[in-house]
Design a protein with these regions (language model features):
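Flexible "stalk/tail and boundary" regions
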Residues: 1-15, 19, 27-86, 90, ...
Length: 147
């Protein structure tokens, strides 16, 4: 979003991929992605979906890291090599590239979750495991991040 607008991407949505590997982005989020989106590998066997403008901000932070630091180079390579500049079709669908579907273990059932500034796409199986873990360990997780 631009200017002083405040927005956040929240919620949990169960979706299905079609035979072309597309998912329909929920209507409430489509305006956020009307100018394009980037789908990338996440750290937790999920996919990350950023509005192009938000992705540019993330990319600028990555690009400003020191090239002399091996971990800076590695995270930059990991992030950009697994990112795809995409858009929504007329029905609000986005094609999830095969390499990303394979990485995240996505076949036909997926869960899309809001993560404030971006969306995450999980295979239903991986999401159910992660969600159960988070529920069971919520107090410890909150303490670890000093929430």
């Amino acid at each position: 979003m631009s200017g002083g607008e405040q927005w956040m991407l929240i919620g949990e949505y169960e979706l299905r991929t079609d035979h072309k590997g597309r998912i329909a982005i929920p209507v409430r989020f489509r305006e956020t992605f009307r100018d394009g989106l980037v789908v990338a590998r996440g750290f937790d066997k999920c996919l990350l979906v950023y509005a192009t403008a938000e992705w540019v901000r993330l990319a600028e932070r990555l690009a400003s890291m020191p090239l002399t630091n091996i971990n800076s180079r590695r995270i930059t390579r990991l992030t950009f090599s697994g990112a795809f500049d995409l858009g929504l079709d007329g029905q609000g669908r986005v094609v999830l590239p095969p390499a990303l579907r394979q990485y995240a273990g996505i076949s036909d059932e997926v869960v899309l979750i809001g993560a404030y500034s971006h969306l995450q796409i999980w295979s239903r199986e991986f999401w159910n495991e992660e969600k159960q873990f988070m529920i069971e360990h919520a107090a410890e997780i909150s303490e670890a991040v000093e929430m």
